[in-house]
Amino acid sequence: MLKFQTVRGGLRLLGVRRSSSAPVASPNVRRLEYKPIKKVMVANRGEIAIRVFRACTELGIRTVAVYSEQDTGQMHRQKADEAYLIGRGLAPVQAYLHIPDIIKVAKENGVDAVHPGYGFLSERADFAQACQDAGVRFIGPSPEVVRKMGDKVEARAIAIAAGVPVVPGTDSPISSLHEAHEFSNTFGFPIIFKAAYGGGGRGMRVVHSYEELEENYTRAYSEALAAFGNGALFVEKFIEKPRHIEVQILGDQYGNILHLYERDCSIQRRHQKVVEIAPATHLDPQLRSRLTSDSVKLAKQVGYENAGTVEFLVDKHGKHYFIEVNSRLQVEHTVTEEITDVDLVHAQIHVSEGRSLPDLGLRQENIRINGCAIQCRVTTEDPARSFQPDTGRIEVFRSGEGMGIRLDNASAFQGAVISPHYDSLLVKVIAHGKDHPTAATKMSRALAEFRVRGVKTNIPFLQNVLNNQQFLAGTVDTQFIDENPELFQLRPAQNRAQKLLHYLGHVMVNGPTTPIPVNVSPSPVDPAVPVVPIGPPPAGFRDILLREGPEGFARAVRNHQGLLLMDTTFRDAHQSLLATRVRTHDLKKIAPYVAHNFNKLFSMENWGGATFDVAMRFLYECPWRRLQELRELIPNIPFQMLLRGANAVGYTNYPDNVVFKFCEVAKENGMDVFRVFDSLNYLPNMLLGMEAAGSAGGVVEAAISYTGDVADPSRTKYSLEYYMGLAEELVRAGTHILCIKDMAGLLKPAACTMLVSSLRDRFPDLPLHIHTHDTSGAGVAAMLACAQAGADVVDVAVDSMSGMTSQPSMGALVACTKGTPLDTEVPLERVFDYSEYWEGARGLYAAFDCTATMKSGNSDVYENEIPGGQYTNLHFQAHSMGLGSKFKEVKKAYVEANQMLGDLIKVTPSSKIVGDLAQFMVQNGLSRAEAEAQAEELSFPRSVVEFLQGYIGIPHGGFPEPFRSKVLKDLPRIEGRPGASLPPLNLKELEKDLIDRHGEEVTPEDVLSAAMYPDVFAQFKDFTATFGPLDSLNTRLFLQGPKIAEEFEVELERGKTLHIKALAVSDLNRAGQRQVFFELNGQLRSILVKDTQAMKEMHFHPKALKDVKGQIGAPMPGKVIDIKVAAGDKVAKGQPLCVLSAMKMETVVTSPMEGTIRKVHVTKDMTLEGDDLILEIE
């Protein structure tokens, strides 16, 4: 039954939750005077202070908190009835170790008793004595017992006297490294240093060899001094792979001692407990009996009173060794409370008031184990970085609760600031179940419910522990973490909502993250998506491809009656008109409509070329994800990509195995037709790309890049014979489809008729595909001429995305062929709806639209031969530099540069080379004659020099001489195919490097992105790791962020939608930040955003750049307590550079490389943030 006592302020529940026995005093024991406690002060902070306050409130006792200057915002001071500052002007830890201030607060405010909590002064006999001397009760053992038990060496002697087995070790604290040497000589390695006046893993260091002895002794001494105010150490033999079992004891002032069974604390890291379990699983009953009886025997030996813990190591043979007594409440007391139903803090207070254990209904025979309890300490430590403490502001805190879950929390709330000064504990989560697996399941569920944003936590690591089969079987020892490296295969939290808020806030404060060429806002009107029928889309040419393979697909195309169209709207059209900036978000919205209404298309060009790197570089999207998502939405129409031969989708040469692997993975992700070309029509490069695409199982479409005019007999370099000869080689190489790729739109109707009819006559069974641009305005006429001459497929873009430097109009071709033998079978009214969508979508990209400076196409393209996309770019660049009126000169220079380089075929990257040389000539006021005459002295653009060296292949007709020799002088020249001499890239090694850098699962697609664009990919991964899945934002939000008071939805995935409202942006704070407020799913959220413009005018410590080898950054926030090197010193890999201290833990920063110290950026006692630059090595 429950026993109550009337006290001031109400009823008091005695120190047991449930008891079947009435309170009876022990017989023949002198009764002490009962002195009720009316006011308790907790000389501690964080969750243990809150735990004691709650117990006091339940007992009707008034509570008093103390706090340091650094803890003014901490929750424990708010949970108490009164709170007082201590340690003014002292270091953070020293404030809670300042006995005079604590005693002064107690005496001045009528405190009856002081509860020490754990850590800090809890095991300091001088503190217990100071309380006693001041007439204030110390809720704990007597000062003498605290002294004996707190001095681990004396406690060891007492254990020996009581007949309790101990680990071989020193009899008293050691005071020199020499004594440590002597002990290791006697007992051998491994040995362990332990702080003589405290626990919790502080001051503990294991040493395995003489070489490690000095460094570990120094660190252990320093840690013990910082944590407990005394650096004394003792040393003992280290028992390998033991279980760490501790027994909870409770004594009163009448000599009654009982135990509350044991806890298993074997899951540790650096002797710091991580997960605690009660009772210990699979513990032999006889061993349990020996452990508990030895614990009671030891407590009686010293006349122990109040709560305490006796700790043991149990070796693999079941032999136990006494370690120490913690004469205080333990962090993990909670699990004992859960399985015994005894409130230990209540009991502590009652014992201090003079109550006996029998009075409280606490008899050994009544203490029973009920089920199993597990405690996890949720901390702001990053398991991926060796559990380094993280600091910062908690942006979101949502805990896991429910049946069987208890939370003992500290300052875990939204807006709380986690400092580097104290322990990193956020909350203790305790799960109680009928057995170990049940408790583990409840704990796992609760941790999965947690949402902590703004600081890193150890929750992913704890979840791995809870799911580990060895843990679930209950057979763990202290090496569990070290022997299970898979525990560190952490599944990163998605944290998508908070990351997106950070992005939106960043844009609201700093403007767009992608360069905006024209200051024009996106259209405020969202494009209307036409109605899409329910059900699967109708069959299309891809169904034929999947059924009959590439050869059968090619036959079907050739046998088709009527003209087939390829739609370039999803790639080349927006590359030409909108600087390749169209986002997956807008492509996905219209994709289902295309699938249902345009199944008669030959294919859709939607991938490859410039879209690949631009997606990562400027849109912060994964190009592979775009392909995957579009494939899912359009399963019936073949996809086509642009493959730059041996350059794949890059601008340089790659090892052959990279090109082959790229095509293989592209095919696996849904790519069908590979349009393979080379910017110089260099056959070896094209053949490699064709082989790679073919071996992947794709449709090979060899594309001959077109320039000149085959209908003009004066243009002899690129004659009909040239194209026919090249076509022969490509057909012989096994192409499934032959393409003429007219990048500048130079094909005139007469040339179309001549070239296509010749190809049709020569290759009657081969599908012919023609690509052009409409810069001149003659694109529709040219494509009709091609169709009439025998072409099977021509390229078009939907009307609102056609014309100018894009492809000819889809609607125009459909209308012109309707009712003729060339009928496309594409419904014209569906083209209108499709076009209307893109007209609206185009308005979202107004800042990138070529019409900002270009109002029409121009027939002068027949003279300058500038490809469509490049024509747009050059036109815009000229206007943005104030040279719009001189664009004519740029085009003239382009013609001259082309002739200087030997009259090239111009398509990326050769077109860029010509463009670079043209701009170089304009900027330097050079004519062709002047540039050629001064070729030996001029510093030409790098792209020009590398072209002349042979880096992109050999142009038709060879390199221009003597210009080439003048420019190159003695630079090396490449003979043959540029990539042929490159060794294979180790893709497995690259994957490992990516995992090491980005710390998450890396896909084959990621590996290939990194192989193609290593720097761009790294920046993309870093950006999205910070800002989340940006492709889920609509384009207006992506470019300019929301307006204040704007409400909107963001769909993360099917069935998961965020409701967001932008509320306000604050003024600038002293750290150069602005606070941005949102409402997310009805709850207030705020984030801090650095104002990049304002920070340029403020001084901050530099950050270490991840990509700069030799820049060493702080691995965690903390204080510099030792610098071991100076500028000019030579260092070896692994050599200590400096020592940081944070949260009472020290970390040695070591050199990752051999070199010389160039500069040291820190001084002793400097406080650093994470990644602050410490020093530079060269």
From Swiss-Prot:
The cofactors required by this protein are: biotin; Mn(2+)
Give residue numbers for the modification (N6-carboxylysine). Answer: K741
Question: Which residues are modified to Phosphothreonine?
Answer: T1003
**Keywords, sorted A to Z:** Acetylation, ATP-binding, Biotin, Gluconeogenesis, Ligase, Lipid biosynthesis, Lipid metabolism, Manganese, Metal-binding, Mitochondrion, Multifunctional enzyme, Nucleotide-binding, Phosphoprotein, Pyruvate, Transit peptide
EC identifiers of the protein: 6.4.1.1
The cross-references to InterPro entries, in alphabetical order and at most eight, read: Aldolase_TIM (IPR013785), ATP-grasp (IPR011761), BC-like_N (IPR005481), Biotin_BS (IPR001882), Biotin_carboxylation_dom (IPR011764), Biotin_COase_C (IPR005482), Biotin_lipoyl (IPR000089), Carboxylase_cons_dom (IPR003379)
Q: Which residues bind ATP?
A: K152, E236, H271
Q: Does the keyword Acetylation apply?
A: yes
Give residue ranges for domain Pyruvate carboxyltransferase: 563-832
Using the record's annotations, give every residue carrying the modification N6-acetyllysine: 35, 39, 79, 148, 152, 241, 297, 316, 319, 434, 589, 661, 717, 748, 892, 969, 988, 992, 1061, 1090, 1124
| Tissue-by-tissue expression | Liver, kidney, adipose tissue, liver and brain.
- Mark out the transit peptide: 1-20
Task: Give the function comment from the record.
Answer: Pyruvate carboxylase catalyzes a 2-step reaction, involving the ATP-dependent carboxylation of the covalently attached biotin in the first step and the transfer of the carboxyl group to pyruvate in the second. Catalyzes in a tissue specific manner, the initial reactions of glucose (liver, kidney) and lipid (adipose tissue, liver, brain) synthesis from pyruvate.
Q: What is this protein called?
A: Pyruvate carboxylase, mitochondrial
Upper taxonomic lineage: Eukaryota, Metazoa, Chordata, Craniata, Vertebrata
